[in-house]
């Protein structure tokens, strides 16, 4: 699959700023500093489309990118980068803004075909588990992407993925994808899962 174009569209600080139109949407959510921006750049084969920050919690808005590919089901779609959660040093006023913004997006987007929950391969936190439970409670069945697996030894990866399945209550082996933004491991699997989600939506 070829990526013809990937461009930043807007940052949304309020629900009325969310994109309108008929394009399908894929949303990425995860803990601050989980490697979300690096993964997005890797997935789209772009160096700095999503800005990578050394300061956790830097993403404070719903950032929208428009993607064009050669795939029939994903020829045009929005990739949505949601604010990272769980970083204590972010001002409380900002954190209080994130919650309603995230909830409004995840509850109200009929074009949303897949939520991708990113978890760090080195630790699954209580907030990760709470986010997983909340997403399920509002009708989403998140795809789990385990980031930074290049930092683990081969034998550690198998054990880590098994533990994440258990910790998040995910039985489907295909619903957890180990990913490395450094090596590209997991990239094809992630694209495959997104194509399947888009295909299912078209068949409905």
Stretches found by the model and what they are:
Residues 1-87:
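Conserved G1/Walker A P-loop phosphate-binding module
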Residues 3-16, 151-204:
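Canonical P-loop GTPase G-domain recognition
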Residues 22, 48, 61, 75, ...:
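Helical mechanochemical/support elements of P-loop NTPase systems and associated helical scaffolds
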Residues 18, 59-64, 77, 83-113, ...:
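Switch II of P-loop NTPase G domains
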Residues 65, 147, 190:
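Residue-level signal for inorganic ion chemistry
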Residues 69-73, 109, 200-203:
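Alpha-helix termini
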Residues 100-174:
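Conserved C-terminal guanine-recognition region of P-loop GTPase G domains, centered on the G4
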């Amino acid at each position: 699959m070829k990526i013809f174009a990937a461009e930043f569209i807007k940052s949304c600080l309020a629900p009325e700023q969310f994109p309108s139109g008929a394009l399908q949407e894929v949303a990425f959510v995860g803990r601050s500093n989980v490697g979300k921006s690096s993964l997005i750049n890797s997935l789209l084969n772009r160096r700095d489309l999503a800005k990578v920050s050394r300061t956790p919690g830097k993403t404070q808005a719903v950032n929208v990118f428009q993607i064009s590919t050669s795939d029939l089901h994903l020829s045009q779609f929005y990739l949505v980068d949601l604010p990272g959660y769980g970083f204590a040093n972010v001002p409380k006023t900002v954190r209080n803004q994130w919650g309603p913004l995230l909830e409004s997006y995840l509850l109200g987007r009929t074009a949303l075909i897949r939520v991708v929950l990113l978890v760090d391969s080195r630790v699954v936190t209580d907030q990760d588990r709470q986010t997983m439970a909340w997403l399920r409670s509002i009708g989403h069945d998140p795809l789990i992407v385990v980031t930074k697996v290049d930092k683990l030894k081969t034998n550690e990866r198998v054990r880590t993925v098994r533990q994440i399945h258990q910790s998040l209550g995910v039985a489907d082996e295909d619903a957890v994808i180990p990913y490395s933004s450094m090596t590209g491991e997991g990239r094809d699997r992630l694209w495959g899962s997104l194509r399947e989600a888009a295909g299912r939506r078209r068949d409905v």
